[in-house]
Amino acid sequence: MNDDKTERPVKTANQRGAARLAAVQALYQMDVGGTGVLEIVAEYEAHRLGQELDGATYLKADAGWFRSIVSGVVRDQTRLDPLIAAALQDDWALSRLDSTVRAILRAGVFEITDRKDVPVAVIVTEYVEIAQAFFDDDEPKLVNAVLDRIAKQVRGETKK
């Protein structure tokens, strides 16, 4: 084990993963706090992405990826929400979902619909892992099922 405190570069994939997590947190904060997109992006870029906050150091994130997800979800929410609602079970309304789950699904669906350069398997896996970071129960399974359904509908493929 190396005790060397030198900073190692963070791989691009990890920076995108960190950006996805930060985007979900920002979308959640916007949903429950009514914060605007410009304000939230500025706050995260100045004080959170790759920064230390309350003794915890945030992983360096791809700021462009973060901005793309947050602004894309806000811009396209009226297109994304019906896709999510249609992929839920008949007795579930999008408004019944936990705010964190809504943020995860919106970000994941945005990437599925708008980031065709990213494989479905990567998108679904990343957002299921984010769900697992917040929930122990059925929520990660729900995220997996909904994103898989939407990927099949939009791209004609599912996570393999």
From Swiss-Prot:
Keyword Nucleotide-binding: no
Keywords: RNA-binding, Transcription, Transcription antitermination, Transcription regulation
GO biological process entries: DNA-templated transcription termination; transcription antitermination
TM region positions: none
GO molecular function: RNA binding
A cellular-component GO term for this protein: cytosol
Disulfide bond sites: none
Domain of life: Bacteria
The UniProt record lists the keyword Metal-binding: no
SUPFAM superfamilies in the cross-refs: NusB-like (SSF48013)
UniProt function note: Involved in transcription antitermination. Required for transcription of ribosomal RNA (rRNA) genes. Binds specifically to the boxA antiterminator sequence of the ribosomal RNA (rrn) operons.
Family note: Belongs to the NusB family.
HAMAP family from the UniProt entry: NusB (MF_00073)
Protein's UniProt name: Transcription antitermination protein NusB
Species of origin: Rhizobium leguminosarum bv. trifolii (strain WSM2304)
Source lineage: Bacteria, Pseudomonadati, Pseudomonadota, Alphaproteobacteria, Hyphomicrobiales
